[in-house]
Design a protein with these regions (language model features):
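Helix-terminus/linker motif at the lipid-water interface of multi-pass membrane proteins
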Residues: 32, 36-54, 123-131, 187-198, ...
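Small-residue hotspots at the loop-to-helix junctions and early N-terminal turns
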Residues: 50-61, 137, 141, 204, ...
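Transmembrane helical elements of multi-pass membrane transporters/channels
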Residues: 22-41, 143, 177, 210-214, ...
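Hydrophobic transmembrane alpha-helices of multi-pass small-molecule transporters
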Residues: 65-68, 112, 181-186, 215-219, ...
Length: 460
């Protein structure tokens, strides 16, 4: 229950695999719920046709971009809070938590204002040539990004809860939000009976309503929990202390740059994909959501490992850090291989769930097979980024990720001009994911073999 969660969240003691799994399972379940959020939207929107899906796909790029920005407050706050708890300094943890929430609120409001101000130019970037798709993109983005502050706060509160070893409260909140979203989607999108059919606007309204409810549940959880919570007593409208902003930015800015760069690169690729028609854009959007069965799960496990590493690093227990990483490597790697097998061997039944036009199904099948080959590597990459970030090595993660993700653009330009055509873009994405997975794993083992990691920690 929300009110009964143990907020002590000490991850520096006890059996490693059991401790890590206990924290990871609710996070992974929450990630699955996030996937179901998006898949539910896409399944209902798919009934409106590929043009509506393409429009939502374009609008979704800007909600995705916002997550990169939001990760500054979330990752910076999560890592700093976890390390403070590992050191036994809960007062500092409280101050970092308050600052993270304040930054999330401010950035969410500013981002919404910018998107609304430049909405037509932002949608025009993708050069959609269909009036219906453009209208859908404008309608969805106006609502989804206009109230994006709910998402920013939910994202950051989840990180702070997780940093304390409480992954159950965010799971319960997300479960409630999913139920609300699943109820509202068909009602608002299709307008059964006397209700008006709102189409893609209905999908956006359902999403932001669910996000607002998730945020509210987590806020309520702060006050009803019996154990200590570093979020208790925070003052949203107090002066933002710059010394804690600096600590959060030191960890969070590289992560934010990495996330936003990844999204911008994906936008460029989406623009290249748009040359092949609305069906191709729709497949990229829906394909990414289907693929989130692996990356959302890996990202959830990465969040658990991030906190585990952060607390144990703060307590100078590097042996637990290494053992926790190895256990996670096996777990996430096997999951990625399972997803690869599903995508490669049964792509058509999956594609038919979301598409009803022959051309779109054919494109989706190719996407799933090609991208599916890299799923295990992508899962391992995301998990390792979580571990390295827990050590405070977000700068290194950012550099590696931006360089090799950025390589997708020239590689895609080269390959799509060959006989591969559209599949050349999918090949560029898949091949770079494989390379990143290998490099990140090698980097983690290289970093943790060095005695410098403990010297760095002693100066924190």
């Amino acid at each position: 229950m929300v009110c009964g969660e143990d907020m002590e969240g000490n991850l520096t003691k006890g059996p490693i695999l059991k401790t890590l799994t206990k924290l990871a399972i609710p996070i992974m379940a929450s990630s699955f719920l996030g996937t179901l959020y998006n898949l539910t939207d896409m399944a209902w929107i798919g009934l409106l046709g590929s043009k509506a899906v393409a429009g939502v796909g374009v609008g979704g790029m800007y909600t995705w971009l916002s997550q990169g920005l939001a990760s500054m407050a979330r990752m910076g706050g999560q890592v700093q809070v976890a390390q403070c708890i590992g050191k036994g300094n809960r007062d500092e943890a409280n101050k970092y938590a308050q600052t993270a929430v304040q930054l999330a609120t401010l950035m969410g409001l500013v981002y919404a204002a910018i998107v609304l101000l430049f909405l037509h130019r932002l949608i025009g970037f993708f050069h959609l040539d269909d009036a219906e798709a453009i209208a859908a993109a404008l309608s969805y983005t106006r609502i989804a990004c206009g109230l994006i502050v709910f998402s920013f706060l939910t994202f950051t509160l989840t990180g702070i809860y997780t940093a304390q070893g409480d992954s159950k409260t965010p799971f319960i909140a997300n479960l409630i939000g999913l139920v609300i979203n699943m109820i509202l989607d068909p009602v608002l999108i299709l307008g059964p009976g006397p209700l008006p059919e709102l189409g893609v606007a209905g999908a956006a309204i359902a999403t932001v309503t669910a996000q607002g409810i998730v945020m509210s549940v987590m806020i309520i959880g702060i006050f009803v929990q019996k154990k200590d919570n570093v979020l208790k007593g925070i003052r949203l409208f107090a002066r933002i202390p710059m010394e804690y902003v600096s600590g959060i930015c030191k960890i969070g800015i590289p992560t934010a740059l990495q996330g936003m760069a990844y999204c911008v690169i994906s936008m460029v690729l989406a623009r290249m994909v748009s040359v092949f028609g609305a069906e191709a854009v729709a497949v990229q959007r829906v394909g990414g959501q289907i693929e989130s069965l692996s990356w959302n799960t890996a990202d959830g496990f990465a969040a658990a490992l991030n906190v585990f590493v952060g607390q144990n690093y703060g307590a100078n227990k590097m042996d637990r850090v290494k053992k926790g990483y190895r256990a996670s490597l096996w777990t996430v790697g096997i999951w990625g291989l399972i997803i690869t097998a599903i995508f490669v061997f049964v792509p058509k039944p999956i594609a038919r769930i979301f598409f009803h036009e022959a051309t779109a199904i054919e494109i989706a099948v190719d996407y799933l097979i090609i991208v599916g080959l890299s799923e295990a590597f992508m899962c391992v990459e995301l998990m390792t980024v979580g571990a390295l970030s827990g050590l405070g090595k977000t700068h290194l993660c950012s550099v590696i990720s931006i360089i090799f993700t950025g390589a997708r653009i020239p590689l895609a330009i080269l390959l799509c001009r060959t006989a591969l055509g559209l599949n050349g873009i999918w090949c560029a994405v898949s091949s770079t994911s494989i390379v990143k997975g290998i490099i990140f794993v090698a980097t983690f083992f290289w970093i943790t073999r060095s005695s410098r990691i403990l010297k760095d920690n002693s100066r924190l």
